[in-house]
Amino acid sequence: MARQTRKVSPTKIKKRTYRGIVYIQAGHHNTIITLANLRGEVLCWSSAGACGFRGKRKATTFAAKKAAEVVAKKSREFALNEAKILVTGPGQGRETAIREIFKAGIKVNVIREKTGIPHNGCRPPKKRRV
């Protein structure tokens, strides 16, 4: 019988994207950071919860810093050197996450604030009586 040779497929090659968009969603309870290319296809993401923080520690600035470090480390695989930053939400980790992206050596073109402001939208929850 003839021996069959197995074809070894090469490992998946990461696409080189030199420009991208960093989305920072800073909520009251968590900070989610997403890195996408200019078409909007997600390359990588991280959050305070994914970095191991639980409960009210997810809302801290330190947790947002760690999440931004993880995304910055992953961005090196894609050779990202220029980015737009789009920030949404009222959370604490906004400025800390932006600072970490600067520290990673990514050149930032634009920082855009996209937090929605209601024009007398939803009724707020009732006041707590403790």
Swiss-Prot record:
Name of the featured protein: Small ribosomal subunit protein uS11c
GO BP: any one term: translation
Cell location: Plastid, Chloroplast
Record has Cell wall biogenesis/degradation as a keyword: no
Name of the gene: rps11
Family: Belongs to the universal ribosomal protein uS11 family.
Keywords: Chloroplast, Plastid, Ribonucleoprotein, Ribosomal protein, RNA-binding, rRNA-binding
Domain of life from the UniProt record: Eukaryota
Record's subunit section: Part of the 30S ribosomal subunit.
Pfam families attached to this UniProt entry: Ribosomal_S11 (PF00411)
Naturally occurring in which organism (per UniProt): Tetradesmus obliquus (Green alga)
InterPro entries in the record: Ribosomal_uS11 (IPR001971), Ribosomal_uS11_sf (IPR036967)
Gene Ontology CC terms, in alphabetical order: chloroplast; ribonucleoprotein complex; ribosome
One Gene Ontology MF term: structural constituent of ribosome
